[in-house]
Amino acid sequence: MRTAERGVRSRARSLVVFLGVSVLAGALAAGLAIPFAGFAGFATQKAAVSMQNLPQDLETAPLAVRSKMLAADGTWIATLYEQNRVPVPLDQISPIMRRAIVAIEDSRFYEHGALDAQGTLRALIRNRSEGSVQQGGSSITQQYVKMSLIEKADTAEQRKAATAVTYERKLTELRYAVAIEKQFSKDQILEKYLNLANFGDGAFGVQTAAQHYFGVSAAKLTLPQAAMLAGLVKNPTGYDPTNNLKRAKDRRDLVIARMRELNLITAKQAADARKAPVIDFKKIRKVPNGCANSRYPFYCEYAVAKLLDNPALGSTPKEREHYLKTGGLTIRTSLDPRIQAAAQASIKEHAKVSDTAIAAITVVEPGSGLVKGMVQSKPYGKGRNHTYYNLNVEKSYPGGYGGFQNGSTMKAFTIAAAIQQGLPLTYRINSPAQIDLSGRRFKTCSGSTRDPNYRPRNSTRSGNLTMIEAAKASTNTYFLQLSQRTGLCSIATIAANLGMYNAQTQEPLDQVVSMTLGVGYVTPLMLSNAYATFAARGKYCRPTVVTSVQDKSGKPVQTPGIGCRQVLTPAVADGVNRVLSAVMEPGGTGGRLNFGNWDLAGKTGTIQDNLAVWYAGYTPNLAAAAVVADATLPYTNLMYGHTLDGQDISDPTGSGTAGPLWQTAMEKALQGMPLRRFVPPNSKITGGDGKSLPPVSGMSPGEATDTLSRAGYQVVLSGDRVNSPEAEGTVAYTDPRTGDRPPPGSQVTLFLSNGQN
């Protein structure tokens, strides 16, 4: 008897609550003040105050939409997302899908307002009998509000409040739901709901869910497919068919039964739908997320790093990353799949994943700085023979390795400094096999520097050489003397203007006596882009990987884009191009790397003790730098004993080891491109504009020095005596020779006779 009385009292209380909620809904819809004081038993005073303080409209967070990164030709590179979602308008969602979700979640959706009074009464009676909230009874609009509040939550406390099983939360949702119903039509609300909902297994929104589970668009969903998806929304994890196929089928069949009960489908349609398989596991499509799943992971990560530096995407790196993964951005990059494939084919031909040495190549377009390709021999990943290091970029970028000493490729900047100062390509310096530079002062930007014990040697040609001859042979003693003549500050300034700096520290390259021999750490990206400046006749363009960004509505997002400036005069660059072209002529260190009818220029680079070898070269169309190196920190292992292409490296050189990588990549990359030519240097660059050197043969050293000094030249006395018909101790000849036209300020070396003809 008492039990029956309790049941009657419970049902009575539920009825009172129902009436209260109905009054509440009406009052909210009318915008009236709520007399909460008389509503005890249904909600606490705290809930009442909360309701009174809520804003009129729900501020929803922008819908998280996945972003895509594309190559220059529009092909896919990567998808970036926090939630895998592609929103679609309601007319691109099949009618059967719309009916299925309404049937199972809110069958009277188009008949009631923000509150479904019948559903709420049913839930309240259940909850009162259980003593806690057990059944939702929420309308689709209320569910949309709840999902929006969860989506908007930034903190754990906000997420907890958005999912709390309390009447206070229900009242909050109801207040917002009333505002939503005033602001949007039923179809608009349903569209928002279906695009926001979580459909399990990482699929957000009905379009992504349809593609994920069935490989079709939301517009093509069939009855059994729609029923399965509609059943997921209540519990995306519990009813996920990839986790529990039986539960997913039971839930799908329940949706089908409900649709039949509401006469939305026929009995035959229901029976046929129940017979259909829930999913075909072979058709499930996982959308790869992030750069790790990209075809070009290293390039992708570098592009993302550049995007995270862009303030147009947010005030902080964290905000930018969030926008990058939720903003539905279309990111177009400079990567050219054809050129990337050419560089990758070269790596495959000349290196193996299992090699103990590493190989890397970057290809850049002169005149734009567009990074067209970036490859390396070690694939992306963990474990044996894999790496997360990007061997082509600076250490300041996530995963950046930080470069390698670049050896004689640095001589190109010394050449540029010499030409800029008026030294012609015919400028001669006596360049012995070994030279003693101990204690010699070299001018720097802050004063001078010297090495107390420095006696460098040549590994190739020595003698009285012109700039072109010395470049062809990569004669160390020539370029060390040339760098003393130009001063290290000039070389450092030109290198910095061409984008060169220490890739380990981001500091300027050290101005040391051996600077021209390439002792600073640089990257293939840095070096290829610097050489591209020569190809572009002195126009430097910062390396660019992201060419444009559009938001989800197609509006452009500001990006740095291409940025170029003239850092060398075209005449100086033309001179550098002529000198480095000679390197690739017969007899030059790069002569074996010549191909086709292209105008080619380049420079070898071999690090002392063979820690790394380089070849950097270019045409007017493309510039590339290839490196082969030991990649074991802290860069102390020699190349000897390492393997490349499965073979032991016995004689590592820039031309013989790194050169073939460069040659194959460039030859393939240039296929189909227009043939362009370097501009020949003018006569002033080639031969100088100075007066003929006055004859001083037969003069005493003092007399010759006075004569040449008055003519504007710097005079150096060689310590070597040479065979000559001139009297012993007098001048036998000079370097440059009598009749040459070195520019004013040039160094002239006096060679004295030993008196032996």
Q: Whereabouts are the PLM-identified features?
A:
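Ligand-recognition elements built from short beta-strands and adjacent flexible loops
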Residues: N597, K668-N757
